[in-house]
Structures are given as C-alpha cells and as structure tokens.
Amino acid sequence: MNSGRPETMENLPALYTIFQGEVAMVTDYGAFIKIPGCRKQGLVHRTHMSSCRVDKPSEIVDVGDKVWVKLIGREMKNDRIKVSLSMKVVNQGTGKDLDPNNVVIEQEERRRRSFQDYTGQKITLEAVLNTTCKKCGCKGHFAKDCFMQPGGTKYSLIPEEEEEKEEAKAEGLEKPDPTKNSSRKRKKEKKKKKHRDRKSSDCDSSDSESDTGKKARHSSKDSKATKKKKKKKKHKKKHKE
C-alpha cells in the first residue's frame, strides 16, 4: 500500500545491475518482476523478453518463475518510480551479461525516442492540416494563426510544386508536339531528296561513259576508213606506173 509519501530510489539496485527475480504478474505487454530487498516491481516489456519477436509474454514466462534480468531504466513519473528490466541481454541459465557495454540497450533506447518524436510530429501536422479555421473558413491553420482582416481576401493552401509538375508532365505526354512531327517530316523529305540526287548522278555518269565509248568507237572506225583509202590510192599509182 502507498502511504501517500513519494517513492524513492534509495532501495533500488543501481543502473545496469543484474539480479534474479520472481515473476509476480504476466500481462499482454510484458511481465512484472519482484526486485529482491525491495517492495517495488520492475517491468520486462515483451520486446526485452527475447532477441526474437514475442507476441504473447505468457508463452515465455509464468507467475512464480525465476528469471535473470538487468535493470536498464529508472525514472520518476507522477511521484511514482518506473523500473525497466531486460531479460534478453542476460543468459537465463548462468546470469551472465550478454551486453556488458550496453550497446544493445542504448540502440533500443535511441530507436524508441526517435519513434516517439516521429509519431508526435506526424499527429501534430495531420491535426493542423485537417483543421478548418473558424475565422476565414479555410483549411490548414487555426483561428489564432489567421491573418485575414474583416472583409479581406481569403487564402487557402496552394498545391505543392511537385504535384503541379506531375500534372504538366501528364498533359505533355497526352498532347503530341507538332514541332517534333514537322521536324521528323523535314528529315524524311531531305533523305528522299538525297536518294533521288544520288540516282540522277549515277545515271548521268553512266550516260557520259556510254557517250565517250561511242565517240572512241566512231573515231577508231574513221581512222580505219582513212587508212583503207590511202592504201587504195597507193595501189592505183603503182598500177599506172
């Protein structure tokens, strides 16, 4: 029974002390352990019962069991002492300290504090964003933070820049760009023109080659004819003589 006087930590073991205690009560969130030489009981939360996940503490311990624990926390709340114990950092067979440098305990404490800070900030922000101002009727702020003058312009939350950018991107994907299409058409037309020019140049070169061949053949025929005429003239002269 509490006599009305605030509890003190004088009879409690020192921080990080290892001792063997008896299980006094088992709940859904952990087990209460009797502290030797003290009327106070300490709580082993289910997250500190084992290195594995524990959903039901009653599957790990039962009332009257003797367990090895390590005192990992002592704090005063509303004139009452809250004692935190851990089973997973102590060998349950020998009572040996499995975390002599308290590394695991410090990591657990850091994680717990960061989680509390994050959830607190999240709840506060959601409460503010979902609040409707009684003064101007807009969402996102309280009446005490409203700067609207009587008869003035009302202002509400504007959409984030990222949302606007995403909408613009979606519109850009839906609507085809006419400049891109025209540039593609121009490129195709240029390729066709180049192909035509190459064909015409090839034809011209073949025609010129055929013309030169014909001229060469014609000139060779003329030279042969002149030679034959000369031979005939010489033959006539000899015959006269």
From Swiss-Prot:
Post-translational modification N6-acetyllysine, affected residues: K144
Keyword Translocase found: no
Extent of Basic residues compositional bias: 182-198, 226-241
Stored InterPro entries: NA-bd_OB-fold (IPR012340), S1_domain (IPR003029), ZCCHC17_S1 (IPR047913), Znf_CCHC (IPR001878)
Gene3D superfamilies, per the entry: Nucleic acid-binding proteins (2.40.50.140)
Primary location group: nucleus
Start-end of Basic and acidic residues biased regions: 166-178, 211-225
SUBUNIT field: Interacts with PNN. Associates with the 60S ribosomal subunit.
Protein name in UniProt: Zinc finger CCHC domain-containing protein 17
Organism of origin: Mus musculus (Mouse)
Gene: Zcchc17
